Amino acid sequence: MRVLYLLFSFLFIFLMPLPGVFGGIGDPVTCLKNGAICHPVFCPRRYKQIGTCGLPGTKCCKKP
């Protein structure tokens, strides 16, 4: 029975969502705090999208 408790605790830890991985960035303040820029429509060349800036079509872009 103790093995089941251990198994359930490991499953709980591994299946828990990680902060920052699934949530992403959703507002301009968080985007700027992460050293990124808000850009309309698409990210400029050599930038990677890491979230949105809250407005439809506005991307949060950061250099890799």
From Swiss-Prot:
InterPro entries: Beta/alpha-defensin_C (IPR006080), Defensin_beta-like (IPR001855). It comes from the Eukaryota. The keyword Signal applies. It holds the Pfam family Defensin_beta. GO terms for molecular function: CCR6 chemokine receptor binding; chemoattractant activity; phosphatidylinositol-4,5-bisphosphate binding. Disulfide bonds join C31-C60, C38-C53, C43-C61. Residues 33-48 are annotated as: Phosphatidylinositol 4,5-bisphosphate (PIP2) binding. SUPFAM superfamilies: Defensin-like. Coiled coil: none annotated. One of its GO terms (cellular component) is extracellular space. It is found in: Secreted. GO terms for biological process: antifungal innate immune response; antimicrobial humoral immune response mediated by antimicrobial peptide; cell chemotaxis; chemotaxis; defense response to bacterium; defense response to fungus; defense response to Gram-negative bacterium; defense response to Gram-positive bacterium. Transmembrane segments: none annotated. Keywords: Antibiotic, Antimicrobial, Defensin, Disulfide bond, Secreted, Signal. Residues 1-23 form the signal peptide. Monomer. Homodimer. Belongs to the beta-defensin family. LAP/TAP subfamily. Exhibits antimicrobial activity against Gram-negative bacteria and Gram-positive bacteria, with highest activity against Gram-negative bacteria. Antimicrobial activity against P.aruginosa seems to be salt-sensitive and is reduced with high salt concentrations greater than 25 mM. Also exhibits antimicrobial activity against the yeast C.albicans. Permeabilizes C.albicans cell membranes via targeting plasma membrane lipid phosphatidylinositol 4,5-bisphosphate (PIP2), thereby leading to cell fragmentation and cell death. Acts as a ligand for C-C chemokine receptor CCR6. This is Defensin beta 4A. It comes from Macaca mulatta (Rhesus macaque). The gene is DEFB4A.
